């Protein structure tokens, strides 16, 4: 039995997107043992993935930390991997390749660089959609891809009956009005107005809820919506995924939870400004759609609510 390594460090949205590619790698190597190397936030989560046999932790310490680098590379070499699928495709993972398999081609180390089409360069190739890039990488590496273009993140779910009973959650609309502090361009400023429109229209038919991350709990209190926590702490990724999957509708900025919603077949809507496009991040699905504008400040709550009504 040979050993296969998949590398996927993060972020949350990236993890959800890669689910189909990971499944295809596993199903194309049924007689191999599948290892996945990731970072601490996703180490325990990936242990739940049925297509992975073992998870390896990469602390991603600085490259100049030679002691850490030495022990990590020594550990990886002991597995004697017959093939590596680099789904992170970062400068860091290219650095790892240069240490582990400096002369390897796509038959040993599959990445966007080793599978790059002859008629383009990496800069142009990276402008394509995420899932299309994964699909090309795996197909060019000789894999039959059935799931790459339609990732299913439902493997991350867990039972949340106790949380739903505590907050009396039956039919609910789940909002994610947050974004990373350094990416404020992604933030739509009218969630408070949207909440009022939803409540005026549906009254008690749907609860309006927010599930903040650990650093978003204080900000969440600014909104007229029920805040969903577990013992006064933010939900973990598995709980959050289940809450999203079982929702009636999701409205989110372009953040990790939006990508989860897209890839668990939840109904919903995500809002895009000029920072990128819904096509490039492969977020639109059968049940999950986007609104793309040049300036999120000019996207009215009424416009979002109208789209919500059409999709709900």
Show which residues each predicted segment covers:
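Conserved nucleotide-diphosphate donor binding/catalytic pocket of glycan-assembly enzymes
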Residues: 56-152, 172-177, 181, 275-278, ...
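Nucleotide-activated donor-dependent transferases that construct or modify glycoconjugates
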Residues: 1-12, 175
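Short amphipathic alpha-helix
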Residues: 15-27, 41-44, 194
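Conserved nucleotide-sugar phosphate-binding/catalytic loop shared by glycosyltransferases and other
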Residues: 33-65, 225-229
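Donor-binding and catalytic core of enzymes assembling or modifying cell-surface/extracellular glycoconjugates
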Residues: 190-269, 273-276
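Nucleotide-sugar donor-binding patch of glycosyltransferase catalytic domains
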Residues: 111-112, 230, 234, 259-312
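Active-site donor-nucleotide binding/catalytic segment of nucleotide-sugar enzymes
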Residues: 152-218
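A short, glycine/small-residue-rich beta-strand->loop->alpha-helix junction that serves as a flexible
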Residues: 7-18, 45, 180-189
